[in-house]
Amino acid sequence: MAGAAARRETRPMPTFVIRLTAPRPSFAMDMTDEEREVMGRHAAHWGSFIEAGRMVVFGPVLDGQGSWGLGVLEADAEDEIKAHAAEDPVVTTGTGTIEVGTLLTGFVRP
């Protein structure tokens, strides 16, 4: 039961979910060179969260409708994530949009 108890422990920071909506469902498979460059800058933009160990998962998701981007990360406040998302090259270039949500509760493996 120690493993189950550990999974029930609260996270040290709130957890947030970001969803990137691309300009078309096939975006992950058929990016132009310009879009690929923007996506490289997008990944670098979130690098500080990855390097700090605050990004739980980050990358494209394929489903029956196409693709979209997912990030699950820890931060002090939702405003921090919203401000960072607003400066994302995907958003500033109009390549896509980013939505931010708060994970209210759940389980995270240790």
Q: Where do the language-model regions lie?
A:
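Conserved, structured core segments of small domains
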Residues: 2-110
